[in-house]
Amino acid sequence: MTLLLAAVGATVTALLELTVGPYLRIGTAQPHLVLVVGIVVTVAVGLEAGLIWAFVGGLVLDVLAQRPLGSTAFALLLCMGFTAVLGRLFIRLRPVVPILATLLLSLFYSMTLFVAFNALRTPIVVADPVSILLPGVVYDTALAALIGPLAISIHDRRAESERVDW
């Protein structure tokens, strides 16, 4: 995957998250498509593509949703970096890494956005933000369980295998 393709994919996914995402809402849970697909891209393709995905997707989300510029990109960049570390730690379990990373990082992503929005805008008064965000974590993890292993196995199957050339 070229870096340009990662940037275009992040832009399209950000547009889908802002336009179709509210219609995919289940109760209070709304999917974070840029985060979930970015985690899958980072595990399947590599850190460079994941960082491009996070930066471009975050900026598109910030501009179109009129958020503080750079807040979403910052949260996504942190998540993609941690995903790359998890991908290296569990190299033998690559199809499972997106599920684990999404389970761990979805709440971190949402809380980072919550803290950034409260620091950069008028504070949002919420007694327990974690209980509000947990359904979204479950939803994102379910999406990663559907998308992640399939995308990684397709990517690995299409990758060139190293052979001894006599």
What are the residue ranges of the model-derived segments?
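Terminal, non-globular segments
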Residues: 1-166
